[in-house]
Amino acid sequence: MNIPKLRKQPIKKDCHGYTWEDDYAWIHQENILEVLKDGTKLLPEVKTYLEAENSYTKKQMRDTENLQKKLFQEIKGRIKLADEGLPYKDKAYEYWSKTTEEGNYSKRLRKKIGSNKVEVYWDGDVEAKGKKFFSTGDLSVSYNDEYLAYSIDDKGSEYFTIYIRRISDNKIIEEPIVDTAGGIVWSFDDQFIFYTKLDKLHRPKQIFRHKIGTSQKDDLLIFEEKEDSFTCSIGTSTDEKFYFITSSEHTTSEKYYFTHDEKIPQPKLFIKRKAGIEYSIDSWDSYFWMHTNDNAKDFKIVRCKHSAIGQWEDFIPAKDEVLIGGLVFLKDWILRSEKINALSKLFVRNVKTDHEEELIISDEEVISPGISLKQKDKNTDIVRVSYESPKTPTRTYEYNLKTKEKKLVKELEIPSGYNRDDYIVRRLNCDGHDGR
């Protein structure tokens, strides 16, 4: 079998004072975004070439087919196919996910707190049935627990379509919302959803508010990012009082906010964007909290009262050679992370006493710890913390912040077998070329 060849058609091009010939410029299609949505619009000659390349590759790799299968089975053997996530409380329900050995996608389940009746409110395998491609963007349950908003891409184009379904009877209640980035944010009163729409260059540039039960053509544009290198997104505050819009590029960000009771949202700017300055905002306990690298190479945390926006005070000041992470809020506790000498650490602060200390969950020398961000119940002393290390698969604990007692509630299983005691992990320090 001969190596597939794509015909050459020299086309002169110039840029920045240089001129050259591009033999394959003819492949470029002006309607490439339409091609992403509908593969039948791909140039027939290019499609034929790609199919020939695939056939050639398969033939050339034929001698390795048994090895490929062996490697695949070895990798697959390290994954527990039938698994169940830990339930987390969200208002009147507990939610969790589940996978099966025969399925390719997860199921989402819930049950009312105090009840044993389990509802499957999302089954990825059922949704994907009959589709050549299937990818879930977001799954979001309304605050009143009655509706599921979800987004899917069934073409591989990364254009997501949003659907809204009544959970009780699994019925889609309105027409789909097309050409979105996939993210979904419910309004706190369950009357609207917010979503980001992709522009003709596949960039998330516009944020719309959609009223449940109406047509997408009537959706309200509440924000548009017009600078080419910036994209936008929307989220909510921890205290469920504000919506936050983020406009950002790789090293610069800008935030806007509006309140839950604004009939027509009027996003208000926090701090004007400045090249190289990143910041994020949250709201809790009558304060706005900002995580920023403004005059803080490795970040700091400041806060201001809702009633005194802009009058920032240090909460966690910048530290030399210490990377400061964000905050997780509970009624009586504030948790956060730091990275010191390339090692991550967790810290917990008692809101009543203002005392802060390190939260230690393992005596291993090198670990990567984390805090569950699914925690919706804020009136608690118990949090889920986890860690993994070069020799320990992920372990998740329920940790009592008051008593410092911890309980192992889940450990990542390796079905093909693994013994962590077969390994030793040591951390060695040595000077670099700069003497540090």
Give the label of every model feature segment:
Residues 117-184:
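A conserved hydrophobic secondary-structure block that centers on an alpha-helix together
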Residues 99-106, 128-133, 152-161, 176-179, ...:
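A flexible loop/linker signature enriched in serine peptidases of the S9 family
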Residues 124, 167-179, 214-226, 263-271, ...:
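Blade-edge beta-strand/turn elements of extracellular beta-propeller
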Residues 109-112, 163-168, 206-214, 257-261, ...:
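Beta-propeller blade signature
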Residues 1-61, 69-83:
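N-terminal pre-domain segments of enzymes
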Residues 308-339, 421:
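Generic long, charged, amphipathic alpha-helical segments
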Residues 44-140, 151, 230-283, 325, ...:
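Non-catalytic accessory segments flanking enzyme active sites
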Residues 94, 145-148, 193, 243, ...:
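Hydrophobic beta-strand positions that form the internal "hydrophobic ladder"
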